[in-house]
Curated annotation (Swiss-Prot):
Taxonomic lineage of the native organism: Eukaryota, Fungi, Dikarya, Ascomycota, Saccharomycotina
UniProt superkingdom: Eukaryota
SUPFAM superfamilies attached to this UniProt entry: Protein kinase-like (PK-like) (SSF56112)
PTM-bearing positions, type Phosphoserine: 17, 19, 68, 72, 160, 273, 277, 324, 333, 336, 358, 391, 395
Organism: Saccharomyces cerevisiae (strain ATCC 204508 / S288c) (Baker's yeast)
UniProt xrefs under InterPro entries: Kinase-like_dom_sf (IPR011009), Prot_kinase_dom (IPR000719), Ser/Thr_kinase_AS (IPR008271)
Coiled-coil intervals: none
Start and end residues of each stretch annotated as Disordered: 1-167, 214-260, 319-347, 401-429, 457-500
Record protein name field: Serine/threonine-protein kinase HAL5
Length: 855
């Protein structure tokens, strides 16, 4: 038995291959059969019917199923059970030099077995046959399962006629010397006997565990290890490779069991780094593209993309102390001249001239008038003291959109709708348009601000009340109102003065009828996280502060309406919370997060509204590259190289404007249309689009500002769009239907006309006409006659683009935009979907930005 075990271990590989080759010899139908030869396809049930003729298998103590097939005891089988003659084994030609003799130590078909069977008692024979039949049925069932589950990798093709079961008589007539145990025959056939014993044992007595172990031999185990490695590489974190004894690198691997010959070691996963950067992928690899056009502020590359590099205002770049982080030094450097004397008037006027924010004010003044106004305010002491200006926005609705959205959504989810549905004792109408910018929250804020503004303006005329007392009174009222409401918290920054929240003034960038626009700067703090709500140079944050004060003789109600409407519209667009209206309307589940709560990239952020005495301060996002008007007037690009137009309109503004490159103008046009479309989707039309109301960041991001004359054509409780009448805005950009007396028009189509004028201004350097009235403007009259007679306008025909196809598509869009009949005019949405805009490459990627309102 010791030699038997040793031979089994040493011939494991060969026994594996041989056992697979003769697997067909031990099919279920071959375990029991009749005396006559049965066909290979005989059903197991047919053999079971003749089980009384089945040979017996004489065994010793049978091993338990838990023992491995390699170490299970050898089974001795009667020749009439296997019906396997030596001539059939010889037909396999596994070893042609070997004789068909069996091993003397492990002979399974020995002559002594036949002799012992003849001398046994008949009763014992029947008892053994019954016992053996039960074992054969169990073995047959196991063999069927193993045959269905196991498919060998290598199979020898053996004809069915060569593996026929032999008759019992043939085995009985086997020669007596067939079991000779001479050393030569024993050594030659020892491996064959080991393979036969191993295969019989594995086929009859192995359980599910041993079957899996048998299946995981060398070839199958390697395959399973590779499969397991792929799964592990995806589900478990990879450990870094370790150095082996030879200095090489070894990754985590699964060793092959029983493989002591140095087989391949498969790693747990692919050999790559622990983390992969998106920039390393082919799609995101930064490939240096050749620049084919460089205009300083605008570059175009050979792959079709472009880059904006707009200049930052000198008030930021020329002020050395702005980057120093010292607010006192920065403030002093602006308010003192070169000789150290206080020369704030001249310095502010000089800085103001490089940036135009005249669009924020309806009264356009030249530089001398603005200087005189600034000087008069300083002499009269009418400058707003930012250190004493406090916010009049209720704390629970204040500034940060994240905090604002969180508190409102929390109140709605908790079912606290009673407070939202109250408006001075009156119920708010039912919400039918939840996407409208003016809804429940805005209505409440309008009422609260209007009351505070009127109260502040009237208290100025009351004797015994000064500005400081009024500001402190407002501060105390806001604090008491905040603390008195359940579920609200008093923010540390909500009641700080303007100078602490937004920094000190570093200069003036604009002036108008109601005051001036200053720039305030403060150092960044740990609470300032990306993305910033305004421009930052890395060390400081900059804010635009617009001072508003009613002129003598102005009606309080008129000033209050303008101030509140401008702030409310801008604040609601830049800090949208349309989920509140949607939840109240029942269109959004209280447990479902809002889907359309985000800031529009092309809308200027309105941050705060503050008060000091009878003056007010509106805090806005600061755009460091100025407005479109300043960009057009300081460019030095030839007209012929950009649009090819030989006939230019006479410049009617100060200075000579220079047009933009068509690709740059197309990018700005697409941003402008997206911003206007965002306003239209939320029920607001701008009604005063012009270069002065279009601001830029240094990277070319466009911002729409000045919502003082905007029209709310649909609120949250209005089902249909309502029109308006009367001309609004600046004359060169006003649509012709606005000049028709007592005629109503769609404010959205007015914005589309204005966008067309703005684009022509960008590519031509000036606007088309002074006013869209044929009796007052000869050029507009010429436009009407040419369109009526020829169907085209010579200025549009002479425009040139980088390609003839883009030029053709642009002309089609322009003709549809400048339809005098508003019913035939293209809409902003249709213009965005035109072939011209779809082929325009834009710097801003717009995703899920627009949500339509009800019509």
């Amino acid at each position: 038995m010791g030699d038997e075990k040793l031979s089994r271990h040493t011939s494991l590989k060969r026994a594996r291959s041989l056992s697979e080759s003769i697997k067909g010899l031990f099919k279920p139908s071959g375990i029991s059969g009749s005396n006559n030869a049965a066909a290979p396809s005989s059903r197991p049930g047919q053999d079971q019917a003749h089980s009384h003729q089945t040979a017996r298998i004489i065994t010793s103590n049978v091993s338990s199923p838990s023992i491995s097939p390699v170490h299970s005891p050898v089974l001795q089988a009667a020749p009439k059970h296997h019906k396997l003659g030596v001539p059939n084994i010889a037909k396999l030609s596994l070893s042609p030099s070997r004789e068909p003799s069996l091993n003397s130590e492990n002979e399974m078909f020995s002559q002594e077995s036949f002799i012992s069977e003849k001398d046994e008692d008949e009763a014992n024979l029947l008892e053994r046959e019954d016992l053996q039949n039960k074992k054969e049925e169990k073995a047959r069932a196991k063999h069927v399962r193993s045959k269905e589950a196991y498919v060998p990798h290598h199979r020898y093709t053996v004809g069915s006629d060569e593996v026929e079961r032999q008759p019992r008589e043939r085995l009985k007539n086997f020669p007596q010397n067939a079991g000779s145990s001479n050393p030569a025959n024993s050594n030659a056939n020892h491996v064959l006997d080991q393979e036969n014993n191993f295969s019989i044992d594995a086929m009859l007595d192995y359980d599910e565990e041993s079957k899996l172990r048998r299946r995981n031999s060398l070839g199958v185990r390697n395959h399973s290890n590779r499969t397991r490695s792929r799964k592990n590489s995806l589900s478990t974190p990879r450990s870094p490779p370790m150095k082996n004894g030879n200095g090489g690198m070894n990754s985590n691997a699964t060793n092959n069991v029983g493989n002591g010959t140095g087989n391949r070691i498969y790693m747990r996963g692919r050999n790559h780094s622990d983390s992969i950067s998106a920039s390393s992928l082919p799609k995101f690899q930064e490939i240096e593209c050749k620049c084919i056009l460089d205009l300083g502020h605008f570059k175009v590359f050979e792959n079709g993309y472009h880059e904006h590099s707009l200049r930052v205002l000198p008030i930021i770049t020329n002020n050395k102390n702005v980057d120093s982080g010292d607010e006192k030094d920065a403030d002093a450097s602006v308010n003192s001249g070169d000789d150290g004397d206080n020369d704030s008037e001249a310095n502010m006027h000089k800085q103001k001239s490089v940036f135009s924010l005249s669009g924020l004010f309806k009264s356009h003044k030249d530089g001398n008038q603005q200087q005189q106004q600034q000087q008069q305010q300083e002499e009269n002491g009418e400058q707003i003291n930012l250190e004493k200006a406090f916010s009049i926005i209720p704390s629970q609705r204040f500034i940060k959109s994240q905090t604002l959205k969180k508190s409102r959504t929390s109140n709605l989810k908790n079912g606290n709708n009673d407070e939202l549905m109250k408006n001075d004792g009156k119920n708010i109408p039912q919400i039918v348009n939840p996407n409208a910018a003016v809804g429940v929250e805005e209505l409440k804020l309008i009422n609260a601000l209007s009351e505070k503004i009127r109260k502040g303006l009237k208290s100025e005329n009351t004797k015994g009340n000064n500005g400081e007392g009024r500001s402190n009174s407002n501060k105390q009222e806001d604090s008491d109102d905040t603390e008195g409401k359940a579920g609200t918290t008093n923010d540390d920054t909500s009641h700080k003065p303007c100078s602490q929240k937004y920094g000190k003034s570093i200069g003036v960038v604009g002036a108008g009828a109601y005051g001036v626009v200053k720039i305030c700067a403060r150092c960044k703090t740990a609470k300032d996280v990306l993305p910033y709500s305004t421009y930052s140079n890395g060390k400081k944050l900059f804010f635009a502060v617009k001072e508003l004060k009613p002129k003598p003789g102005d009606q309080i109600d008129k000033f209050c309406t303008r101030l509140t409407s401008e702030f409310i519209i801008g604040h609601s667009l830049s800090h949208p919370h349309f989920e509140a209206n949607a939840m109240i309307a029942g269109n959004v589940s209280r447990t479902t997060p809002p889907k359309h709560v985000f800031n529009a990239p092309n809308i200027l952020k309105i941050l705060d509204l503050m008060e000091y005495s009878n003056s007010f301060v509106e805090v806005m996002e600061f755009c460091a590259s100025g407005d479109l008007y300043s960009l057009l007037t300081r460019n030095n690009i030839s007209n012929e190289s950009n649009n090819g137009s030989s006939r230019l309109i006479q410049t009617v503004k100060e200075g000579s404007g220079s047009p933009l490159h068509p690709l740059e103008a197309d990018c700005f046009m697409k941003q402008l249309l997206n911003g206007v479309q965002y306003m239209h989707d939320h029920g607001i039309a701008h009604c005063d689009l012009k270069p002065e109301n279009i601001l830029f960041q240094p990277n070319g991001l466009l911002k729409i500002c000045d919502f003082g004359t905007s029209s709310v054509f649909q609120t949250a409780w209005e089902k249909h769009v309502h029109f308006q009448s009367g001309a609004m805005g600046s004359e060169p950009y006003v649509a012709p239907e606005e000049f028709i007396r007592d005629a109503e028009y769609d404010p959205r189509l007015v914005d589309c006309w204005s966008c067309g004028i703005v684009y022509c201004t960008m590519v031509m350097g000036q606007y088309l006409w002074k006013i869209a009235i044929p009796e007052k403007d000869s050029l507009f009259k010429s436009f009407l006659s040419e369109i009526k007679d020829d169907g085209q306008f010579y200025l549009f025909e002479e425009l040139r683009h980088v390609s003839s196809e883009l030029n053709r598509l642009r002309k089609i869009a322009l003709y549809r935009t400048f339809q005098v009949d508003p019913t035939k005019r293209i809409t902003i949405e249709q213009l965005l979907q035109s072939s011209w805009m779809r082929k325009t490459k834009c710097c801003v990627v717009y995703r899920h930005l627009h949500t339509k309102v009800s019509k």
